[in-house]
């Protein structure tokens, strides 16, 4: 008996240790990932902005890939792909505290955060100086001997010889990254630091998984080693290459990481008829019938992270047009979201077509499609392409093309979605109700189309809008009927078949028109010697310039708060996603601040004496100087202009005296509207 117990506990310990190792990407995974940023998306990817979207993502998005969250050596806005600090998580997208709050909010909504891990290369102060960082009482620092000996086409070695320092004896294992030091992953010191860093991201910050940047630069064996050390569940590598090379890399990791399915993306792009920001041909949707991708292969589709566009392909500017889709974005997403692999939706697509993409995701999940589902082709013509994917709950047919009416499935399918160049059909075996408008917030009343997906042709739909479960006695409509949603409500719609209600679907709608409001941005330059009395504000957002052209608008309005002089300017927030980017300056070719994201609420900035690349940095002191979020400590205000505005307790400036009851700030005092 004692021997049997020892064997039993040994087996338990062995299984526990096995479970600690990384699995690369879960099998039969039904989740959908969102790339939570695009290039220079400082407006929309602030941690505070993303946190406000968590409730809206719930039930649709399961993973969000965040931009690199570590602090860089630059103090201006940067995307983070030249990392400097590992354990300092204050970035252009927000503070570490805001990041932790975001990840906690995601987790509360069933969403995991994927860290952008950039460890192929690292930035330095000068040529060779890496920061010394202390975490949990241990100091971590890379040295010059952790740099690959042939870094930057051996220009680093030339500089090392001049400076009398040594590099690693090992060459780079892959593609070189110019402008940063390529790290030697064979170095024990490098391995120790990166493992500590990844454990910090996962166990302390709270990330669920990792997206490894530029994995062509170092061996996949290291990714396997790092993932084993952290026991991470989700890992995806950016191996931008031909399909077989991506497969080889996955094998090199011992299948302990997934990879982005670049060739899936190119199949979609080619079918649409675009390349390098040019329309090169008419669409030929039959080109989607390709086996040159990870998604088609039953052995590797578990590790396929499919996508149709990302930050390295989107249109950035006329000088960096890159390789965007340009057209048929909805059809591309419809195809991706109906196929196996784990789809990764691009943030600009999500923002532009959220309602449609939500419905696509809902259909995918209703059918039970996973990253390992099987599919068959139903039609492959120039103007029409159709695939049938078998989920673990039902089957879903996606039809895309310029003539989607060319394919109609049999009577065992019901059409549930239709849009520009795409259609979705769900097998009637699903036996469910369906609504074509997903849960979410809407700015105006709308009509919702209800569909009975049932093998019983006489099935009806019953629904309620008060959140109660529908019964046979509830409001009843025929399949294909439209109902009006004219206020915030919870719609529950069920399938009424042979007197029984089944297949109930729930939709939570918030109907609320956006009300434009005004924020104020304040600037104080007392710390900067000889700044003078001239102050220009230059502001912009994705909609364009919010002030006069550079150097902006000359600001003469000031307020004195507790003896401190503040220049200020009001900005109208016209949509829920709008923000304000701002630079303070003295005029053309004179002193100026770094650029800052002021968000969409009142902000106070002190221009400091510290500089970055010749530009003055600013300290956000809103918490000290803003109209109070509490009721105490209201500052004494002396205006050079009359301020008769009304403010909410969060500092939001209103256009007029509020009609809604509540507590407000008016002329520096708390006022209660009853």
Region locations from a protein language model:
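Surface-exposed, short loops/turns at beta-strand junctions within beta-sandwich domains
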Residues: 482-490, 573-578, 658-660
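C-terminal outer-membrane/trafficking sorting elements
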Residues: 629-674
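Aromatic- and acidic-residue-enriched carbohydrate-binding clefts of CAZyme catalytic domains
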Residues: 29-31, 72-104, 134-184
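Active-site-proximal helices and loops of the catalytic beta/alpha 8
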Residues: 23-39, 49-58, 68-70, 75-82, ...
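Substrate-binding cleft of carbohydrate-active enzyme catalytic domains
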Residues: 95-131, 135-137
């Amino acid at each position: 008996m004692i021997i049997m117990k020892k064997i039993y506990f040994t087996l338990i310990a062995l299984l526990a240790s096995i479970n600690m190792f990384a699995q690369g990407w879960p099998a039969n995974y039904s989740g959908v990932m969102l790339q939570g940023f695009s290039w220079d998306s400082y407006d929309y990817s602030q941690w505070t902005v993303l946190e406000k979207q968590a409730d809206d993502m719930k039930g649709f998005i399961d993973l969000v890939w965040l931009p690199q969250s570590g602090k860089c050596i630059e103090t201006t806005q940067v995307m983070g792909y030249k990392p400097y600090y590992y354990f300092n998580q204050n970035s252009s997208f927000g503070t570490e505290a805001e990041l932790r709050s975001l990840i906690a909010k995601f987790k509360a909504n069933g969403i995991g955060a994927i860290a952008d891990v950039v460890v192929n290369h690292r930035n330095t102060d000068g040529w060779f100086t890496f920061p010394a960082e202390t975490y949990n009482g241990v100091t971590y620092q890379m040295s010059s001997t952790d740099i690959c000996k042939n870094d930057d086409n051996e220009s680093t070695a030339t500089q090392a010889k001049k400076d009398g320092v040594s590099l690693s004896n090992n060459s780079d294992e892959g593609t070189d990254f110019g402008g940063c030091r390529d790290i030697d992953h064979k170095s024990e010191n490098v391995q120790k630091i990166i493992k500590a860093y990844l454990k910090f991201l996962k166990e302390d910050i709270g990330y669920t998984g990792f997206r490894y940047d530029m994995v062509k630069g170092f061996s996949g064996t290291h990714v396997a080693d790092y993932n084993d050390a952290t026991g991470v569940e989700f890992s995806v590598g950016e191996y931008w290459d031909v399909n077989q090379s991506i497969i080889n890399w996955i094998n090199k990791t011992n299948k302990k990481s997934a990879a982005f399915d670049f060739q899936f993306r190119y199949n979609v792009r080619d079918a649409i008829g675009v390349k390098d920001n040019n329309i090169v041909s008419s669409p030929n949707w039959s080109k989607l019938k390709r086996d040159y991708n990870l998604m088609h292969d039953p052995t590797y589709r578990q590790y396929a992270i499919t996508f149709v566009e990302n930050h390295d392909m989107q249109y950035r500017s006329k000088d960096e047009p890159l390789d965007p889709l340009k057209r048929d974005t909805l059809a591309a997403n419809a195809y991706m979201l109906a196929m196996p692999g784990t789809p990764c939706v691009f943030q600009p697509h999500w923002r532009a077509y959220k309602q449609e993409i939500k419905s696509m995701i809902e259909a995918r999940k209703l059918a039970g499609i996973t990253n390992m589902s099987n599919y068959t082709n139903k039609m492959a013509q120039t103007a029409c392409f159709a695939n049938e994917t078998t989920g673990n709950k039902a089957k879903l047919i996606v039809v895309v093309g310029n003539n989607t009416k060319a394919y109609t499935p049999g009577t065992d399918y019901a059409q549930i979605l239709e849009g520009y160049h795409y259609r979705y059909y769900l097998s009637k075996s699903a036996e469910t109700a369906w609504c074509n408008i997903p849960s979410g917030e809407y700015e105006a009343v709308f009509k919702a189309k209800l569909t009975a997906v049932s093998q019983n042709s006489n099935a009806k739909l019953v629904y309620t809008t008060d959140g109660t479960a529908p019964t046979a006695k509830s409001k009843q409509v025929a399949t294909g009927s439209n109902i009006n949603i004219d206020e915030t409500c919870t719609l529950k719609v069920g399938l009424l078949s042979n007197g029984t209600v089944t297949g109930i679907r729930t939709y939570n709608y918030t109907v609320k028109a956006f009300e434009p409001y005004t924020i104020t941005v304040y600037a104080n330059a007392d710390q900067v010697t000889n700044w003078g009395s001239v102050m220009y504000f230059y502001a912009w957002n994705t909609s364009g310039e919010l002030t006069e052209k550079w150097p902006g608008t000359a600001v003469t309005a000031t307020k004195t708060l507790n003896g401190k002089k503040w220049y200020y300017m009001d900005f109208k927030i016209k949509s829920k996603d709008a923000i304000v980017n701002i630079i303070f300056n003295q005029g053309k070719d004179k002193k100026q601040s770094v650029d800052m994201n002021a968000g969409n609420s009142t902000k106070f900035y002190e221009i400091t004496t510290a500089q970055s690349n010749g530009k003055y940095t600013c300290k956000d002191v809103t918490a000290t100087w803003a109209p109070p979020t509490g009721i105490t400590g209201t500052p004494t205000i002396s205006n050079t202009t009359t301020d008769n505005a009304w403010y909410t307790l969060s500092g939001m400036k209103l256009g007029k005296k509020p009609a809604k009851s509540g507590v407000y700030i008016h002329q520096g005092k708390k006022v209660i509207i009853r």
